[in-house]
Amino acid sequence: MVRHMGFDTEPTGYEKTILSDLQGAWQCLRREIAENPGFDGWERALLHTDEAMSWESVRNLRQMQRTLLLVRNILQRADVPQGVAECLEEVSALMDETLAALASGEID
């Protein structure tokens, strides 16, 4: 008996775009935190941002959402530079959009 191995299908264009945008927003946030050290909690925020960008989180968006909540809580308690706050808002908006697309079946 010959068994054929199944292959996963390639993500749709929308899925690639929204996930790429989300990854880019996390990279922006990480860069802003790293370039503006010194505010209260910056090292913890950087650590958890790296965690959110890990393969485990990318493959489990609910885990990424939990990590975003943690990062947001750390940053909102501190007097962060404007660039950090703007990148945090972008990550939050794209996370919401990505989770909505996941819930509606637009991405898996």
Model-found features: residue ranges?
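Short terminal alpha-helical segments
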Residues: 2-49, 95-107
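Low-complexity, intrinsically disordered regions enriched in charged/polar residues
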Residues: 12, 16-19, 23, 58, ...
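Extended amphipathic alpha-helical scaffold segments
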Residues: 22-30, 65-75
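Charged, low-complexity interaction regions
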Residues: 31-42, 57-65, 79-85, 107
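Short, charged, amphipathic alpha-helical segments
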Residues: 43-50, 65-70, 85-89
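Extended, amphipathic alpha-helices with heptad-repeat/coiled-coil or helix-bundle character
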Residues: 47-58, 68-78
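Amphipathic alpha-helical binding modules
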Residues: 75-108
